[in-house]
Amino acid sequence: MYLVADILESKKMNIVSYKSPEVSLPRDGGGILNLKEFRPKNVVLFFYPKDATSTCTKEAVSFSQAKAEFEKLNTVLVGVSKDTVASHEKFIVKNDLNVPLLSDDGAEICEAFNVWKEKSMYGKTYMGIERSTFLIDGHGNIIKEWRKVRIKNHVEDVLEAVKSL
């Protein structure tokens, strides 16, 4: 598997128009979810830093509330973080979420999408997920990306992008 991060570094460009890296990760409820299972549907793949934090909760709830609208447009929603499957399951129950959440505990998929970044807080640096969303078409091509996402109106912006396909 190639890393999108390698493409970005070597060509100094974004990843739009490239094939999506293969995504196959443990999911809530058990088992493995592979994005290829959804073809020929579009996929909105959203990466978020941590379950049960205020901004991540707002984002996941917003996507869940818009799920039916995305489904009408032949589009599936999938969330990814480094949290465990058990954490995802608690997060889903507590917030009545209805989208699958994948556990990338080793950050391999986060690295492949170049969302695993150095961050800093209170003078300390650490590695973490940069909130990002990718729109992947039914052929597995990345057709739009949102980086350093601010959640206000984000779901609406993603929905508009899907409508424009």
Model-predicted segments: where are they?
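Chalcogenol-based redox active-site neighborhoods
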Residues: 2-165
